[in-house]
Amino acid sequence: MRCLCFLFLLIAAPAAMAGEFRSIGDNAAPMYDAPSVKANALFVASRFYPVEVIVQLDAWTKVRDVAGDLAWVEKKNLSDTRTVVVTAALADVRQKAEDGASLVFQARQGVALEVIELGAGLWVKVLHRGGQTGFVRANQVWGL
């Protein structure tokens, strides 16, 4: 019966638009295998961690992370702030959206960066929580 109710909720819930990304808010958030705090906690996502929205229920959101894993998170733990996570071993963040532009800083794999501006091209303007801004190649990050 429990499984049947769960299945009904999944079918009845409106599916999120493909490519809708959110981020974990100001505090780390537990990620569950079902939409309940009584479910198994899979891992704790760090603050500002980007996630792709898959399904939304009233108080819960099913998300996909950078590794492709699916989990449930309480909606109250999500933020509308757009972030990306570095997937390259080391991403160059440059002053302009050009390969030859001055290097502002480098970000290691797993570092979350706030999206300031989504360009139509191959670059994304980002903000490091240390205050530095610059452009990173879109193929070096996940969350777009």
Roles of regions detected by a PLM:
Residues 1-5:
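Positively charged n-region of N-terminal signal peptides that target proteins for export
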Residues 16-33, 41-49, 54-132, 136-144:
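SH3-family beta-barrel domains
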